[in-house]
Swiss-Prot record:
One GO molecular-function entry: single-stranded DNA binding
Lineage: Bacteria, Pseudomonadati, Pseudomonadota, Gammaproteobacteria, Enterobacterales
InterPro entries according to UniProt: NA-bd_OB-fold, Primosome_PriB/ssb, Prisomal_replication_PriB
Every SSB domain range: 1-102
GO CC annotation terms, alphabetical: primosome complex
PROSITE patterns in the record: SSB
Described purpose of this protein according to its UniProt entry: Involved in the restart of stalled replication forks, which reloads the replicative helicase on sites other than the origin of replication; the PriA-PriB pathway is the major replication restart pathway. During primosome assembly it facilitates complex formation between PriA and DnaT on DNA; stabilizes PriA on DNA. Stimulates the DNA unwinding activity of PriA helicase.
GO BP annotation list: DNA replication, synthesis of primer
Protein name as annotated: Replication restart protein PriB
Self-association state and partner proteins as the record states: Homodimer. Interacts with PriA and DnaT. Component of the replication restart primosome. Primosome assembly occurs via a 'hand-off' mechanism. PriA binds to replication forks, subsequently PriB then DnaT bind; DnaT then displaces ssDNA to generate the helicase loading substrate.
Protein's organism: Yersinia pseudotuberculosis serotype O:1b (strain IP 31758)
SUPFAM superfamilies: Nucleic acid-binding proteins
Keyword annotations from UniProtKB, A to Z: DNA replication, DNA-binding, Primosome
Family: Belongs to the PriB family.
Amino acid sequence: MTTNRLVLSGTVCKTPVRKVSPSGIPHCQFVLEHRSTQQEAGFSRQTWCRMPIVVSGQQSQALTHSITVGSQLTVEGFISCHQGRNGLNKLVLHAEQIEFIDSGD
């Protein structure tokens, strides 16, 4: 099996952290908060999640400097499991495409 795609829209809720790996690859990490109403089994359901996002590579870094807390984005990429410093595993969305959502203001 090779399919691993996720598209999620939401609002950046934690300040982006920019780092460079020991191998020289720039990374930007932030958290995207999603809230929506979805249909399930014929009923409306309120959904909510916070998803850690990682953007890697030189070509993406110019875009990430425009991302701030409150930015509304649609992020597309693949998910992977990362082990945190506390030893717990968490899902992380590795962004391959990011679009800013026009707030209409």
